[in-house]
Design a protein with these regions (language model features):
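Conserved ABC ATPase "signature" region
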Residues: 22-39
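Conserved ABC ATPase signature
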Residues: 44-48, 52
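Catalytic Walker B motif of ABC-type/P-loop ATPase nucleotide-binding domains
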Residues: 69-73
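Helix N-cap at the start of a conserved alpha-helix in ABC-type nucleotide-binding domains
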Residues: 80-82
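Q-loop/switch helix immediately C-terminal to the Walker
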Residues: 2-17
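Hydrophobic anchor residue at the start of the ABC signature
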Residues: 58-59
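H-loop/switch region of ABC-family ATPase nucleotide-binding domains
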Residues: 103-105
Length: 119
C-alpha cells in the first residue's frame, strides 16, 4: 500500500506541476487547517480513513496553487466538524485568489458557500 506522503508527491511529479515546489511545511499548515494529525502523513493508506484521505487530497489541491479548484462531493465522508473545517479552508483559498467550484448534496455545506446554483 502507498503511504499518504507518496500519494501527496505524485501530482508534483507531473510535467504540468513541476514548476510548483512541494513543501511539507505548507502541507502540514493545510493539515492543521483541515484538522488532520501530522502523523497521518507517515501511515499506510489503508490505515487512514476515507474522510482523512479526502482532506489530505484537498490540501494537495491547495498546494498546487491553481487558479481554479474543482471538487466533487468534498464533504461526503465527513462529520459536521470536519465539514466546517473544509468550508473554512475553501474560503481561505478563495481569499488567496483561487476560485473553488464544488458539487455537493450537503445542504449545510452548500449554504456556507458564497454562490449557490441548485439543479
Amino acid at each position: 500500500f502507498l503511504m499518504p506522503r507518496e500519494m501527496v508527491s505524485l501530482p508534483f511529479e507531473l510535467k504540468v506541476n513541476r514548476s510548483v515546489p512541494f513543501s511539507e511545511e505548507r502541507l502540514f499548515m493545510c493539515f492543521d487547517e483541515l484538522g488532520l494529525e501530522h502523523e497521518l502523513y507517515f501511515k499506510r493508506v489503508n490505515e487512514v480513513s476515507g474522510g482523512q484521505r479526502q482532506r489530505i487530497m484537498l490540501a494537495v489541491a491547495a498546494l498546487l496553487n491553481k487558479p481554479l479548484i474543482v471538487i466533487d462531493e468534498p464533504t461526503s465522508a465527513l462529520d459536521t466538524g470536519s465539514t466546517d473545517k473544509v468550508l473554512a479552508f475553501f474560503r481561505r483559498q478563495a481569499e488567496k485568489g483561487a476560485a473553488v467550484l464544488a458539487v455537493s448534496h450537503d445542504k449545510d455545506f452548500a449554504s456556507g458557500c458564497h454562490y449557490l446554483i441548485e439543479l
